[in-house]
């Protein structure tokens, strides 16, 4: 019976669906295990072979854990909101809901073909109202919460209001945008609008002025990762920095908990380090600088308080409010021109780019430690969102300050004994402090740091700042609050309306979900409002508690709804929780369900989400933990980043000025231009010439210079991309070789966490392996050849070696070496002509996570009437692995002369006798005396003769 993969795979797809093999329920009699893939954005292009890499890896592990007796939750869904669908809608007029639905259907079809063990009854789509109801619900809860630094958790905003009523801001230690001070009497005297404005300063979800990446052509704010080289990633439109009033989430309040939590989870060191750097904890001091000839002052934050005596200039971020306040009249034109230029650069570009730019403000600041007036400059290497948006520049001991000082000819004053700053700054934090104050200069303050180590000087300066009311000791974080609104259509609507004072009010939770309205255009309105401004019915009737026509707005009982929508990360920040209880219409997740599944045991996805989704999900989960909604503070116990499957591009070589193409090894004889060719018409680098001629009209009459009658293409490893014609559709592989071959081959390409090129040159070998496996069961006949005979020692050794190896490899995600071990074992069993049930049944159980279709078929051929998914993972027996004999190297005076096979359990004495009495030893001992024999058990017998 031949291995007919098409027939087998369809048969078992149908069976798994009909029997609901992968449907999972809470089962307190079994230990749980939750395996999750980062769910895909369903683009119109569908899946290419790079996408399933992580999905296959997680599927193998899910099946493995089920075979070990775990109750495994392994769901799949779609991150369905996003800019690409909206842009397509703008270009074609087709509603993004339709294109998204079609794309999801395509993805689902492709995923099902590969044979994943997803529980499709739990499928979620972030654009479904039943799903985004809970995104809106979480937002309302954040709006109605503040963060208490003392208790280190979110608390109801009503408690903060009560504190204001009782004692104002006295004694409060809470996360806020701006530190305010008022008494209870002052609070009570404020209007409702003033109170609401103040509360926005403390709410976890709030509206605030923030610097954003604004793309006028797209009519929306873009996240940093949506901007490349100053233009939008989507469409390549110009992007500028702009201050806008936006909805934000106070992620910064959770900065320390986000840091501390990294010590409790099993993530790679590199990923943890990325998050630590992104959160950016800095211990330092805030110091106030007065502006010369003015009553103004401003604050800087520094981690190097020891360098106060080396400040030779100050720098403001271009976005700082101080820029307008401190720019003098004669410098205004130059400053304004500079600000216009910097608007075109994102923060990421400013951080990465070392080009020095800046402009003098015309004002000076007084150094509180030296009394010197130092110039205040403006430069885009300072960011408004970190620290205070102003820095003190110490060019001798900071590389960016040094480059700036060199460029503009500013003083560089070294503060460490023996340091040379003639060519570069001295950034090391070790050494003895000098010039603090400088010799021969009348001290301005009574602090001297000279002779102290840098560490001692930092501590002394911090104490001086605190004792003399020059500022305060402070911990800063680089982590910013998340901008949470987008001027787009295709996203979650905010459950927000604006009252007569234009203050935001939340919809009642029982009125959720607030549905995304229909619009006739997906572009901003003529007056610049977001696309929801086109909606006819987009006002909130507070009496009837429903959406009504915009024309009815009276700002008494009917009010305008928010026109922005939520960003892409809104729907992906808690989706792992919804999978636990996807059909619950009363709660995000029921308490008993959450306490059973708890959190994700294994999460697999790409490293590109390190500073976006993975930060926001952790924040979101911690907030829900504070509210008592979830029982675990961290959402993802273990995280693995799969590598990327790169494209293997092929090239043909056109002789310049002709339509003639020359084969790879002959191209150096001509002047040629390499041209990308569709990899799907190339096999093992051999071009299908007829297919090439039919590929594009311009090649219909192409001519070829061949070698040995063949056209050999060139190749290169590049990003998999449609423009390079190197995208490989998994459907084609499944059709030609089967899903099991695709699954095995993707894992066989190399270590899971490394990037590797897609190369079909080895896929035939994997397919042959499955045929060889099939042959163990059927031989060359149409009937099953498996017997119940007792297995031999060699057969048992081969099997148990495999059990041990594959178990270890799966637990360590070393799938490529597992597949090598399978191939070795099947070769050994084929050589042994093994057809024993006691060997072959455990073999296919081991293979089931990797190649579930063929394993299921062979399992049923062996007479089982239940799915192999419910079999039990075999355990190896060390007794079968013990070697019966071992090869000794027999040496004379330290030189190996021959090998001798001896029993593995032989004693040292018997090994010595065997070596001395062996016929091969006679010639090396002839005429000599044996002086000593050294036996290293299991390895060497060394005979010393003389």
UniProtKB/Swiss-Prot annotation:
Keywords: Aminoacyl-tRNA synthetase, ATP-binding, Cytoplasm, Ligase, Nucleotide-binding, Protein biosynthesis. CDD domains: Anticodon_Ia_Leu_BEm (cd07958). A motif ('HIGH' region) lies at residues 40-51. Its EC number is 6.1.1.4. One of its GO terms (biological process) is leucyl-tRNA aminoacylation. It comes from the Bacteria. It catalyses: tRNA(Leu) + L-leucine + ATP = L-leucyl-tRNA(Leu) + AMP + diphosphate. It is an enzyme of class 6 (ligase). ATP binds at residue 722. GO terms for molecular function: aminoacyl-tRNA deacylase activity; ATP binding; leucine-tRNA ligase activity. InterPro entries: aa-tRNA-synth_I_CS, aa-tRNA-synth_Ia, Leu-tRNA-ligase, Leu_tRNA-synth_edit, M/V/L/I-tRNA-synth_anticd-bd, Rossmann-like_a/b/a_fold, tRNAsynth_Ia_anticodon-bd, Val/Leu/Ile-tRNA-synth_edit. A motif ('KMSKS' region) lies at residues 719-723. Belongs to the class-I aminoacyl-tRNA synthetase family. NCBIfam families: leuS_bact. This is Leucine--tRNA ligase. It comes from Parabacteroides distasonis (strain ATCC 8503 / DSM 20701 / CIP 104284 / JCM 5825 / NCTC 11152).
């Amino acid at each position: 019976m031949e291995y007919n993969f098409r027939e087998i795979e369809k048969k078992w797809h149908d069976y798994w669906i009909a029997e609901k093999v992968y449907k999972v329920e809470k089962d307190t009699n079994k230990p749980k295990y939750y395996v999750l893939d980062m769910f895909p954005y369903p683009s119109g292009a569908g899946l290419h072979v790079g996408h399933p890499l992580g999905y296959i890896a997680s599927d193998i592990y899910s099946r493995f854990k089920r075979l070990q007796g775990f109750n495994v939750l392994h769901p799949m869904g779609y991150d369905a909101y996003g800019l690409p669908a909206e842009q397509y809608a703008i270009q074609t007029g087709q509603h993004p809901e339709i294109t998204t639905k079609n794309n999801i259907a395509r993805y689902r079809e492709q995923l099902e073909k590969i044979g994943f063990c997803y529980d499709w009854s739990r499928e979620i789509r972030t654009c479904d109202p039943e799903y985004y109801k809970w995104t809106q619900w979480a937002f309302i809860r954040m709006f109605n919460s503040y963060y208490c630094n003392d208790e280190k958790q979110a608390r109801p905003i009503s408690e903060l209001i009560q504190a204001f009523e009782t004692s104002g801001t006295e004694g409060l230690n809470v996360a806020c945008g701006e530190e305010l001070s008022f008494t209870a009497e002052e609070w009570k005297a404020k209007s409702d609008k003033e109170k609401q404005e103040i509360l926005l300063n403390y709410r976890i979800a709030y509206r605030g002025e923030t610097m954003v990446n604004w793309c006028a052509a797209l009519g929306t704010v873009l996240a940093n990762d949506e901007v490349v080289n100053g233009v939008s990633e989507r469409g390549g439109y110009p992007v500028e920095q702009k201050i806008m009033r936006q909805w934000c989430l106070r992620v910064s309040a959770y900065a320390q908990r986000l840091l501390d939590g990294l010590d409790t989870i099993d993530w790679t060191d590199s990923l943890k380090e990325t998050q630590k750097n992104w959160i950016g904890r800095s211990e330092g001091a805030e110091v106030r600088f007065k502006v010369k000839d003015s009553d103004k002052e401003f604050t800087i934050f520094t981690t190097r308080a020891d360098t106060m005596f080396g400040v030779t200039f100050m720098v403001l971020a271009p976005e700082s409010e101080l820029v307008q306040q401190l720019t003098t009249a004669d410098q205004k034109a130059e400053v304004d021109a500079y600000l216009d230029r910097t608007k075109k650069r994102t923060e990421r570009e400013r951080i990465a780019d070392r080009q020095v730019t800046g402009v003098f403000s015309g004002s000076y600041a007084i150094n509180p430690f030296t009394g010197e007036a130092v110039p205040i400059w403006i430069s885009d290497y300072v960011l408004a969102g970190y620290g205070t948006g102003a820095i003190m520049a110490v060019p001798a001991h900071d590389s960016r300050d040094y480059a700036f000082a060199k460029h503009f000819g500013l003083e560089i004053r070294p503060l460490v004994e023996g340091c040379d700053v003639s060519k570069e700054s001295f950034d090391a934090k070790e050494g003895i402090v000098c010039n603090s104050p400088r010799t021969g200069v009348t001290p301005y303050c009574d602090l001297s740091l000279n002779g102290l180590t840098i560490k001692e000087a930092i501590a002394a300066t911090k104490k001086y700042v605190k004792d003399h009311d020059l500022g305060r000791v402070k911990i800063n974080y680089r982590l910013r609050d998340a901008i949470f609104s987008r001027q787009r259509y295709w996203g979650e609507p905010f459950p927000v309306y604006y009252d007569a004072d234009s203050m935001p009010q939340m919809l009642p939770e029982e009125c959720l979900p607030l549905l995304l309205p229909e619009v006739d255009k997906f572009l901003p309105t003529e007056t610049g409002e977001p696309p929801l401004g086109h909606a006819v019915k987009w006002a909130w009737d507070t009496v009837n508690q429903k959406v009504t026509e915009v024309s009815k707005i009276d700002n008494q009982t009917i009010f305008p709804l928010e026109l922005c929508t939520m960003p892409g990360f809104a729907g992906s920040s808690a989706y792992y929780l919804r999978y636990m209880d996807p059909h619950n219409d009363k709660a995000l997740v029921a308490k008993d369900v959450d306490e059973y599944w708890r959190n994700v045991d294994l999460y697999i996805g790409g490293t590109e989400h390190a500073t976006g989704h993975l930060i926001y999900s952790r924040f979101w989960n911690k907030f829900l933990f504070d509210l008592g909604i979830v029982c675990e503070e961290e959402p993802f116990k273990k995280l693995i980043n799969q590598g990327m499957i790169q494209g293997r591009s092929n090239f043909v070589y056109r002789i310049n000025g002709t339509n003639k193409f020359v084969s790879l090894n002959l191209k150096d004889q001509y002047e040629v231009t390499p041209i990308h060719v569709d990899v799907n018409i190339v096999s093992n680098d051999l071009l299908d010439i007829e297919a090439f001629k039919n590929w594009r009209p311009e090649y219909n009459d192409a001519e070829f210079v061949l070698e040995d009658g063949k056209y050999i293409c060139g190749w290169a490893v590049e990003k998999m991309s449609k423009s390079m014609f190197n995208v490989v559709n998994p459907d084609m592989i499944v059709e030609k070789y089967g899903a099991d071959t695709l699954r095995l081959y993707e894992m066989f390409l190399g270590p899971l966490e490394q990037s590797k090129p897609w190369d079909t040159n080895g896929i035939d070998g994997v397919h042959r392996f499955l045929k060889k496996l099939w042959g163990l069961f059927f031989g060359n006949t149409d009937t099953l050849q498996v017997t119940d005979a007792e297995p031999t020692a060699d057969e048992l050794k081969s099997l148990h070696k495999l059990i041990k190896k594959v178990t270890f490899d799966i637990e360590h995600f070393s799938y490529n070496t597992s597949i090598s071990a399978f191939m070795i074992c099947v070769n050994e069993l084929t050589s042994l002509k093994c057809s024993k049930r006691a060997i072959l049944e455990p073999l296919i159980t081991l293979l089931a996570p990797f190649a579930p279709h063929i394993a299921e078929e062979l399992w049923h051929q062996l007479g089982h009437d239940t799915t192999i998914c419910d079999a039990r993972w075999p355990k190896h027996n060390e007794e079968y692995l013990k070697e019966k004999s071992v090869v000794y190297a027999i040496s004379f005076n330290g030189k190996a002369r021959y090998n001798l096979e001896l029993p593995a359990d032989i004693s040292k004495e018997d090994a010595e006798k065997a070596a001395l009495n062996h016929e091969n030893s006679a010639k090396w001992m002839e005429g000599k005396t044996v002086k000593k024999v050294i036996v290293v058990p299991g390895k060497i017998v060394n005979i010393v003769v003389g």
